[in-house]
Structures are given as C-alpha cells and as structure tokens.
C-alpha cells in the first residue's frame, strides 16, 4: 500500500501544481474547454496514463467543464501516486486548452 503524505509534503507538492488545489484528503483540478467535445477528448486522453499508473481519477463533466479529483482510496488520503498522476494530467491539459 502507498504511504500517506504528511501535510508538509502535501503543501510542498501542491505548490508545484498551480492547476490543482487540496480539498480535504483529495487534490482537484477544474478545467474549462472550448465545448463538450473538447472536454470529452481531453478525458479520453487520460485513460492511457491512468491505466499505466494503475491509479484512476474521479472525473466529473459538466458540458465544457471537467473536474478531476485524485486520492488514494486504499491508503485513505493523499500519496505520491496522486501527485505523480496530477503532474501528467496537468501536462495533458495544457495541450487541450
């Protein structure tokens, strides 16, 4: 099982991810796209890196707005896996915006 990060580690990591914010025991990114199709295209691009990492985000889509939430459920909070995948998602989101 992945090890939970301390508050100090979380604050350090989130500082390097300006697109993300800490919400309780999760990190979250909200991104708006041109339209619904662009939002869905972006979400589809997340499948491969999530599968490769063995770590899957919670995703909510509302027309052109995508909300991505990461936490490590089996650890009960935030782990390095969350921040590693958040970094990849941030890089992909810059291509699609």
From Swiss-Prot:
UniProt KW Lyase keyword: yes
Enzyme type, top EC level: lyase
Protein name in UniProt: Putative pterin-4-alpha-carbinolamine dehydratase
Catalytic activity as recorded in UniProt: (4aS,6R)-4a-hydroxy-L-erythro-5,6,7,8-tetrahydrobiopterin = (6R)-L-erythro-6,7-dihydrobiopterin + H2O
Matches recorded under Pfam families: Pterin_4a (PF01329)
Example GO molecular function: 4-alpha-hydroxytetrahydrobiopterin dehydratase activity
Family stated for the protein in its record: Belongs to the pterin-4-alpha-carbinolamine dehydratase family.
InterPro entries attached to this UniProt entry: PCD_sf (IPR036428), Pterin_deHydtase (IPR001533)
One GO process term, biological-process aspect: tetrahydrobiopterin biosynthetic process
Cross-referenced PANTHER family: PTERIN-4-ALPHA-CARBINOLAMINE DEHYDRATASE
Keyword terms of this UniProt record: Lyase
Record's keyword annotation contains Lyase: yes
Top-rank lineage group of the source organism: Bacteria
Listed EC numbers: 4.2.1.96
């Amino acid at each position: 099982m992945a090890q939970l990060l301390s508050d100090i580690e979380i604050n350090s990591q989130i500082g390097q991810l300006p697109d993300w914010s800490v919400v309780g025991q999760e990190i979250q990114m909200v991104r708006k796209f041109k339209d619904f199709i662009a939002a869905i295209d972006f979400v589809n691009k997340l499948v491969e890196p999530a599968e490769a990492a063995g770590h899957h985000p919670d995703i909510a889509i509302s027309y052109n707005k995508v909300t991505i939430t990461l936490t490590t459920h089996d650890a009960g909070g935030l782990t390095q896996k969350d921040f590693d995948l958040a970094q990849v998602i941030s890089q992909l989101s810059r291509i699609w915006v």
